[in-house]
């Protein structure tokens, strides 16, 4: 069920965490401004509301993140797992990429583009590289075996989804800051008044949160994580090549196998004309 998928490692760290960060000022306000000494109906409603809010934010972040992802690929000429396979890209050495192309061509049952073919038709070559990326993604789902790749995927998903909720989070920050300032103004900025210190804490959280969203959450950060994931995805070919290993050299089947010298046997009691037994 989709509900239980929400609690897997990727969903928690790449989808739920961005939602929690985006709603941090609101969560701080609910925690500090509502009494939790006794768990009553208002607390129950607030708790359910928070869970629903986080679910909605996580879904919105994923949708917006994917939309931003498409624009980033367009700006940089394609997915990193495609652009890094190109011969014009030096992120991964050409010798390794030649081995990866040959391996993936065998898995896909398609010929890898030569240097001349790629230079003549980059779009066709990119189509092949896109198929390579799809094959690798489908065959590297073992998060224990490909733990480094899984970590890069989570980092990319986290940054992408957090960027997706950057604008709504900043709007929420502005609203909370305005409300907190108005409340403190009505208290004559008396932090010792009832709820004065709690409102001040919420205000500080909102300001710090806004600074983080403005300075740390950016398209450049998402693209950097995307490149790290794309590089690791291509390098995962090494694991498959290690499993296959180098095939042993086969003897030349066109030449007859050399016969081993027959071992000398004691004379048989049977007639000397009898034919000696053949070797197995």
Each language-model region and where it sits:
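N-terminal first transmembrane alpha-helix
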Residues: 1-97, 220
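Cytosolic/matrix-facing juxtamembrane and C-terminal tails of multi-pass cellular membrane proteins
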Residues: 1-15, 195-196, 212-280
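Transmembrane alpha-helical segments and their cytosolic interface motifs
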Residues: 8-23, 137-188, 196-197, 202
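Hydrophobic core of alpha-helical transmembrane segments in multi-pass integral membrane proteins
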Residues: 21-31, 177-179, 207-211
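Hydrophobic alpha-helical transmembrane segments
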Residues: 35-52, 182-209
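Structural signature of transmembrane alpha-helix termini at the membrane-water interface
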Residues: 56, 60, 64, 68, ...
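Charge-rich cytosolic interhelical loops and cytosolic tails of multi-pass membrane proteins
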Residues: 69-148
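Juxtamembrane membrane-interface segments of multi-pass membrane proteins
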Residues: 134-137, 143-160, 224-247
């Amino acid at each position: 069920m989709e509900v239980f998928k929400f609690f897997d490692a990727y969903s928690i760290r790449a989808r739920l965490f961005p939602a929690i960060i985006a709603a941090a000022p609101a969560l701080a306000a609910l925690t500090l401004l509502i009494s939790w000494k006794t768990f009553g109906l208002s607390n129950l409603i607030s708790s359910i509301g928070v869970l629903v809010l986080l679910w909605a934010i996580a879904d919105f972040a994923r949708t917006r993140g994917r939309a931003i992802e498409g624009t980033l690929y367009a700006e940089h000429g394609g997915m990193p797992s495609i652009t890094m396979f190109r011969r014009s890209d030096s992120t991964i050495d050409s010798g390794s990429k030649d081995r990866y192309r040959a391996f993936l061509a065998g898995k896909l049952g398609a010929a890898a583009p030569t240097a001349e073919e790629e230079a003549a038709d980059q779009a066709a070559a990119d189509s092949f590289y896109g198929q390579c990326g799809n094959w690798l993604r489908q065959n590297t789902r073992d998060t224990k075996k490909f733990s480094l790749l899984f970590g890069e995927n989570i980092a990319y998903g986290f940054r992408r989804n957090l960027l997706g909720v950057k604008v709504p989070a900043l709007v929420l920050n502005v609203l909370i800051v305005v409300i907190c300032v108005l409340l403190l103004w009505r208290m004559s900025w008396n932090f010792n008044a009832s709820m004065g210190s709690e409102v001040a804490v919420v205000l500080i959280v909102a300001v710090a949160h806004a600074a983080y969203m403005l300075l740390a959450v950016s398209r450049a950060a998402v693209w950097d994580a995307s490149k790290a994931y794309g590089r690791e995805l291509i390098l995962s070919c090494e694991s498959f090549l290690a499993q296959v290993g180098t095939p042993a050299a086969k003897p030349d089947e066109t030449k007859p196998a050399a016969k081993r010298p027959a071992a000398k046997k004691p004379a048989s009691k049977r007639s000397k004309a009898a034919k000696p037994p053949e070797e197995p």
